A protein has these predicted regions:
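Short, well-structured alpha-helical segments
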Residues: 14-25
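Active-site cofactor/substrate anionic-group-binding motifs, chiefly glycine-
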Residues: 35-89
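Internal helical hairpin/lid segments
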Residues: 209-221
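A generic, well-ordered mixed alpha/beta core segment in the N-terminal half of proteins
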Residues: 67-157
Length: 221
């Protein structure tokens, strides 16, 4: 597998490379190109710079019976989730509700595989993460909010879970970057140029511009 070999060659151990390459493969399979091979160069850059520890293992602890903490030790978030989710599920089944708080990790990646897996165990799942400012509120031209994606899933009897994953911007920044790479335009209302003008050019949004909130002005609230 290309992704796995590349990750190992740039500082990941076998388990980390296998975990991350599986996520990349599944994102490509599901049509989420912004979380597939597109992400590999950024992972390699982080590994080479030392920002990401490709051999780290998270430390999992219980703050309360319902609160699980995962210190990622500068690993990639998929590794943290691999170790943290079993403890989260166990705590939720024992107490009725539980939270997993993650620190010191890099790039949450796609979140729906994890919320879907939790829902397949009969639990309702909700996940969220923050992102650097990239979204301007309605009427503004400077970024204030992150794209701050969320994902949720819930089980259904004798049916696959309902699963939802979205950025709280008009579009995920990764999708804008993919559109730029492939030469596609984006819908009007996706974002603004660095001068605050509406544009359908993803390059003008990704390179110094800003995204707009999902749902137009209502998304600013």
């Amino acid at each position: 597998h290309l992704a796995k070999k590349t990750l190992i060659a740039n500082g990941c151990d076998e388990e980390t490379a296998d975990t991350l390459s599986t996520l990349i493969k599944n994102a490509e399979r599901d049509g989420s190109l912004s979380h597939g091979l597109f992400r590999l160069p950024a992972y390699v850059s982080g590994l080479k710079s030392g920002k990401i520890n490709g051999k780290a293992r998270p430390v999992i602890s219980k703050l309360t019976p319902s609160v699980v903490k995962a210190d990622g030790k500068n690993s990639l978030a998929p590794m943290v989730l691999k170790y943290g989710i079993p403890e989260l599920v166990k705590a939720a089944k024992e107490n009725g509700v539980a939270v997993l708080a993650i620190t010191n990790s890099h790039h949450m990646a796609a979140m729906w595989p994890e919320t879907e897996a939790i829902a397949e165990q009969g639990l309702v799942a909700f996940a969220c993460t923050s992102y650097k400012p990239a979204v301007a509120p309605a009427g503004a031209i400077k970024p204030l909010f992150g794209t701050n994606p969320i994902s949720f899933a819930w089980p259904r009897k004798n049916k696959p879970p309902v699963v939802y994953d979205m950025a709280t911007a008009s579009m995920a920044m990764g999708e804008v970057q993919v559109a730029k790479r492939e030469g596609h335009k984006v819908p009007i209302g996706t974002g603004l140029t660095k001068d605050g003008k509406e544009t359908t050019d993803p390059g003008e949004i990704a390179d110094g511009g800003v995204l707009l909130p999902f749902g137009g002005y209502k998304g600013s609230g």
